């Protein structure tokens, strides 16, 4: 699972990275349903501090899914291999690269430079 703040930086979501609750409802603890949704979608729920942050995370996850962008788990895995700007990758591109790495016994394919690779 992915830390929500790391995820915010990976997808360049400044509003999420610097989130501060404004309204009283945002300051309440996140609901069990919100935390379950976040965990199911790859976010580490124990570090979600309140209902407002959970709502914003869920909104970002849904928007990114509609846009066909990489998931939190895909982003984290590919960043571990040294790829950059993975938060901008399409789901399909991330999936294909993960398959290539998996087919290569979880090593980067020879000749592939993760730091400069663009899908």
Which role does the model predict for each range below?
Residues 1-119:
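Non-catalytic terminal extensions of ATP-dependent helicases
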